[in-house]
């Protein structure tokens, strides 16, 4: 599956658009990668076993490379639908700046390199978990689920939830209940995040033939499920405090953030006009980005304060 666009000069001869380093960086999905790296870092730092800072850096680098490689392969496979959607039509492959072949090779090299580096320098359990995450994101989500079911991001969301477990595995050689709770928070966060996006981008998804929840089940059902998963997410977010993995600082601030998230989801559910729905969907979407970063940030700050100041 290769998508290519070319320009023409005055004589009608085709001229491939020029590609630069920025286009290759764009293929890595840097915004998504930054969240992957951050959540993996938290999983690594708060694990019960300390890791040498140099090896910790290498582990996070491997996760970043693997996440970037997965992003490239996702853009490679989705180039046809990216060309249709307004939000994605200017990405490097559909715009013709990078050929599908180059993108595929780039993504495969990064993905394999990340796994081999993780196994060689860190441990093979973390490497296998990283390889499984890349496989899950590309094969299970991108190729199998995304174009077939409105539950695509519910199941496929597991791929984005694995990084904290990989971080923990890099430090300890295994996974534990703490890393699973971090996985669960991201897993439950994914549906409200992406379905709120799909509410104000439903025409785009519909034109591309992607069966997102609003296009298949309707707006009302989508809003109800956003509220439902938001509640499940906030329960999951309380988990670290309940099992004494996090302290009172985390409990207070995560509760405040969770209440705000539920408020936005409730307002979205009650919105009875198109304009009100779009407005609340955008507010819910953008707050969800802040929420996840803040939850993990609070957990990290609390751990560092306890480790370096109190102990």
Curated annotation (Swiss-Prot):
A Pfam match: UbiA
GO cellular component: plasma membrane
Record's keyword annotation contains Transferase: yes
Keywords: Cell inner membrane, Cell membrane, Heme biosynthesis, Membrane, Transferase, Transmembrane, Transmembrane helix
Coiled-coil stretches: none
Transmembrane portions of the chain: 32-52, 53-73, 104-124, 125-145, 153-173, 180-200, 224-244, 245-265, 290-310
EC number: 2.5.1.141
GO biological process, one term: heme O biosynthetic process
Gene3D superfamilies in alphabetical order: UbiA prenyltransferase
Catalytic activity: heme b + (2E,6E)-farnesyl diphosphate + H2O = Fe(II)-heme o + diphosphate
Pathways involved: Porphyrin-containing compound metabolism; heme O biosynthesis; heme O from protoheme: step 1/1
Subcellular location: Cell inner membrane
Record bears the keyword Membrane: yes
A GO molecular-function annotation: protoheme IX farnesyltransferase activity
Membrane topology: Multi-pass membrane protein
Extra remark: Carbon 2 of the heme B porphyrin ring is defined according to the Fischer nomenclature.
Function as written in the Swiss-Prot or TrEMBL entry: Converts heme B (protoheme IX) to heme O by substitution of the vinyl group on carbon 2 of heme B porphyrin ring with a hydroxyethyl farnesyl side group.
Similarity-based family: Belongs to the UbiA prenyltransferase family. Protoheme IX farnesyltransferase subfamily.
The protein, known as: Protoheme IX farnesyltransferase
Gene (UniProt): ctaB
């Amino acid at each position: 599956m290769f998508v290519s666009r070319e320009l023409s000069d005055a004589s009608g001869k085709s001229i491939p658009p020029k590609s630069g380093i920025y286009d290759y960086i764009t293929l890595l999905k840097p915004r998504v990668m930054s969240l992957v790296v951050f959540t993996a870092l938290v999983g690594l730092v708060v694990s019960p076993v300390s890791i040498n800072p140099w090896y910790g850096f290498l582990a996070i680098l491997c996760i970043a490379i693997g996440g970037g490689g997965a992003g490239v392969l996702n853009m490679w496979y989705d180039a046809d639908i990216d060309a249709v959607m307004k939000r994605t039509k200017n990405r490097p492959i559909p715009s013709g700046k990078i050929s599908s072949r180059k993108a595929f090779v780039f993504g495969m090299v990064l993905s394999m390199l990340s796994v081999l580096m993780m196994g060689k320098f860190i441990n093979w359990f973390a490497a296998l978990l990283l390889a499984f995450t890349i496989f899950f994101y590309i094969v299970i989500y991108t190729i199998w689920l995304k174009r077939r079911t409105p539950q695509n991001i519910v199941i496929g969301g597991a791929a984005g939830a694995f990084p904290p477990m990989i971080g923990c595995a890099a430090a300890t050689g295994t996974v534990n209940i703490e890393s699973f709770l971090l996985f669960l928070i991201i897993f439950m966060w994914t549906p409200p995040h992406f379905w709120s996006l799909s509410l104000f981008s439903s025409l785009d998804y519909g034109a591309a033939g992607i069966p997102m929840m609003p296009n298949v089940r309707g707006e009302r059902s989508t809003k109800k499920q956003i509220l439902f998963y938001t509640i499940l997410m906030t329960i999951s977010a309380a988990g670290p405090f309940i099992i004494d993995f996090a302290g009172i600082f985390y409990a207070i601030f995560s509760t405040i953030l969770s209440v705000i998230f539920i408020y936005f989801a409730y307002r979205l559910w009650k919105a009875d006009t198109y304009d009100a729905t779009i407005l609340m969907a955008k507010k819910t979407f953008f707050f969800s980005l802040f929420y996840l970063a803040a939850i993990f940030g609070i957990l990290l700050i609390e751990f560092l304060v306890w480790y370096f100041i109190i102990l």
